[in-house]
């Protein structure tokens, strides 16, 4: 099947790009999008045959309207087609999709006791280094470690670099490396002279956060970014970019989720710099997905499987958690322990086996992440939902608002 890159394009005004997060974090807006239920009381059919949705949810019968006492008073109205009800979007195949404008702190009202939210506990490391070759300033962004103390990295002005070049990086630590190899996508393999604890300390002193290129920081990251660009779950060093859906959570929100009987599990996927690389193939099925290292412990796999067996939905917080879970699931929907690289590339037509609900930020046009949400909730549904988000003033990308999506193939 041919998937044209242009099919995943959309117009995004520059003023919709968020350059700083809202405060508090859980005050960010949350766009619920579902085809056969979800924010309106959806329960997965593999568990809830004939069982009434949990308390506080409206019926999942087709055409049932959301409860007025729970509707956001700031509800934005669709502008694409005035003939459609304000909470309906074009659907993919069987059903109309419906939306609801909420805020992140409403999440406990949108989930049920026994659901399990799966969060990525990776911690962002300072990974951007600068050096000079002659008069040229070279920016190196570490991507992921390789064998024997080497790193794969992305290099700006990579054409100036050659195998065997010795790089001495700016900063007080005298950090240095030699280029072992180059690849065609601006990547290099580096061997640093410093190793282990000495290398980690040098990074802390000499490197800066590798903020996404769409976040405007003319003079580099600001002091607030050191905390703003980490999730409350951050525990395991290794990511170059934040798992941004997790940025919306606060201790207060977690307390309410726990009090409602909503479970939580931790996985680790170290988000690499490759997440920022554009898709260059017109037929996107030819795109080579970057690999990232992830882990799911045996206890986490057991907790997720138990939640599903007990009737709970698997709620992935972010595309990183989703891709890792889908990399570790078998044909029956059981999660196995996992430790290794994943380069799973999800396009429309993919059959999801692990995840029922996805919370994720709003993504770039033509990106692999927008392709993923189209696969999860339906391409036409997501194109219409993003058009609604633009018209309603939602904030996009890493520091922006979030969406709550439900698998339309159920």
Question: Where are each of the predicted segments found?
Answer:
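N-terminal polybasic/positive-inside topogenic patches
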Residues: 63, 80-83
